[in-house]
Amino acid sequence: MMMMDLGFLEGGAGMADAGHDESGSPPRSGGVREQDRFLPIANISRIMKKAVPANGKIAKDAKETLQECVSEFISFVTSEASDKCQKEKRKTINGEDLLFAMGTLGFEEYVDPLKIYLHKYREVIGDSKLSSKAGDGSVKKDTIGPHSGASSSSAQGMVGAYTQGMGYMQPQYHNGDT
């Protein structure tokens, strides 16, 4: 399980304010470094390139702006999920908490597809853990076929398949059918 340092959420500071004191100056010591506040620009760029034509170009400031927006979005959703966990006296935020938060914050149209993705992801991870425990504790490369779903690369492949099906540029509307 991946653990996140959510120190920037304390005191109500958003991502745009994180890393600066009241005067707007960068922190002296122990503050949040920029690379800890934002996702890597290369990852942002790679995702953005999937949404534009092959010959399309993306300006550096557009990438940097989206990098900040994505980080703020993560903070926004995580903060809402954290509030839910605190009310329920739990310390660990799970996938369902994040989906609940997204629905609460007005992103309802993403909740059902993400529930499906989360379920399939957990199946893949579960298969991977079972395969690892079955033998000598390691997953054999030659036993993992393209459809076995038993490796972390399968889980990573799911991300690409899922995001391609999301239709970045066009909202997905359904007439009550899921």
Swiss-Prot record:
DNA-binding region coordinates: 39-45
Molecular functions per Gene Ontology: DNA-binding transcription activator activity, RNA polymerase II-specific; DNA-binding transcription factor activity, RNA polymerase II-specific; protein heterodimerization activity; sequence-specific DNA binding
Alphabetically list the UniProt keywords.
Activator, DNA-binding, Nucleus, Transcription, Transcription regulation
Region annotated Subunit association domain (SAD), chain positions: 66-77
List the residue ranges of the region (Disordered).
131-156
Q: List the disulfide bonds.
A: none
Q: Which Pfam families match?
A: CBFD_NFYB_HMF (PF00808)
User: Which tissues is this protein detected in according to the database?
Assistant: Ubiquitous.
Would you tell me the Gene Ontology cellular component terms? Answer: CCAAT-binding factor complex
User: Where is the protein found, in the record's own terms?
Assistant: Nucleus
Q: Which GO biological process entries does UniProt record here?
A: regulation of transcription by RNA polymerase II
Q: Which PANTHER family match?
A: CCAAT-BINDING TRANSCRIPTION FACTOR-RELATED, NUCLEAR TRANSCRIPTION FACTOR Y SUBUNIT B-2
Q: How does it assemble?
A: Heterotrimeric transcription factor composed of three components, NF-YA, NF-YB and NF-YC. NF-YB and NF-YC must interact and dimerize for NF-YA association and DNA binding. Interacts with NFYC4 and NFYC6.
Function description: Component of the NF-Y/HAP transcription factor complex. The NF-Y complex stimulates the transcription of various genes by recognizing and binding to a CCAAT motif in promoters. May regulate the expression of photosynthetic genes, and may be involved in chloroplast and amyloplast development.
What family is it from? Belongs to the NFYB/HAP3 subunit family.
The protein's name: Nuclear transcription factor Y subunit B-2
From which organism does this entry originate? Answer: Oryza sativa subsp. japonica
Gene name tied to this protein: NFYB2
